Curated annotation (Swiss-Prot):
SUPFAM superfamilies the record matches: Alpha-L RNA-binding motif (SSF55174)
Assembly description: Part of the 30S ribosomal subunit. Contacts protein S5. The interaction surface between S4 and S5 is involved in control of translational fidelity.
Protein name in UniProt: Small ribosomal subunit protein uS4
Function statement: One of the primary rRNA binding proteins, it binds directly to 16S rRNA where it nucleates assembly of the body of the 30S subunit.
PROSITE patterns: RIBOSOMAL_S4, S4
GO MF annotation terms: rRNA binding; structural constituent of ribosome
UniProt keyword list: Ribonucleoprotein, Ribosomal protein, RNA-binding, rRNA-binding
PANTHER family per UniProt: 30S 40S RIBOSOMAL PROTEIN, SMALL RIBOSOMAL SUBUNIT PROTEIN US4M
GO biological process: ribosomal small subunit biogenesis; translation
HAMAP family: Ribosomal_uS4_B
All residue ranges annotated as the S4 RNA-binding domain in the record: 94-154
InterPro entries: Ribosomal_uS4, Ribosomal_uS4_bac-type, Ribosomal_uS4_CS, Ribosomal_uS4_N, S4_RNA-bd, S4_RNA-bd_sf
A Pfam family recorded for this sequence: Ribosomal_S4
Length: 205
């Protein structure tokens, strides 16, 4: 299954979950927390499989991954010792594109992924254009200075850095467009609407 590139607002409505994590999709006068269409309010009780599938889809769409990417990330993460669900969420959070988003360089994960794809970031002084690149404790990523640092003057990036609050596990130097990945996030610091145990059960069947 390919990565979803359609309307985030519509998908959030269908899932009853804010993919943007801001609730913006359900702001007054915009969208409602039920599926789009004439019969959006009529929801039959989902099966046990349906409940697990919906939870997986919520998180997959939130991070913007294809099914293959999502499943592979889960399998790699859960080979480590620890709580499977937490390890999985930490693996998703430590992706370079997600960290670019969490640091405040972009308003959405889609925008962050595009910045990485276009080669605008260095990790430990080396160009990395792979969104799925896994950051480790102590890694440093920053906006490139190539082409006379043109990307550092991008107004959209500057506005995002100014208005968004970076994640607690990232040390952001806004003046130098540089970020230190200090540590893995604690589960309590991540989205509390996610029931990762259902995803673990889904992939364990």
């Amino acid at each position: 299954m390919s990565r979803y590139t359609g309307s985030i607002f519509r998908k959030s409505r269908r899932l009853g979950f804010s993919i943007l994590e801001t609730g913006k999709e359900f702001a007054k006068g915009k969208q409602r927390r039920y599926a789009p269409g004439l019969h959006g309010l009529r929801r039959s009780k989902p099966s046990d499989y349906g409940v697990h599938l919906r939870e997986k889809q919520k998180v997959r769409f939130m991070y913007g991954l294809s099914e293959k990417q999502f499943r592979n990330t889960y399998r790699k993460a859960t080979k480590k010792t620890g709580i499977a669900g937490t390890l999985f969420l930490q693996a998703l959070e430590s992706r370079l594109d997600n960290s670019v988003y969490r640091a405040g360089f972009a308003e959405t994960r889609r925008q962050a992924r595009q910045l990485v794809n276009h080669g605008h970031f260095l990790v430990n002084n080396k160009k990395v254009d792979i969104p799925s690149f896994q950051l480790k404790q102590g890694d440093i990523f920053e906006l490139t200075t190539r082409k006379d640092g043109k990307i550092r003057k991008n107004q959209q990036i500057l506005t995002s850095l100014e208005t968004r609050t970076p994640a607690a596990w990232l040390e952001v130097d806004k003046d130098n467009f540089k970020v230190v990945f200090n540590r893995m996030p604690e589960r309590s610091e991540l989205n509390q609407e996610i029931k990762e145990s259902l995803i673990v059960e889904f992939y364990s069947k």
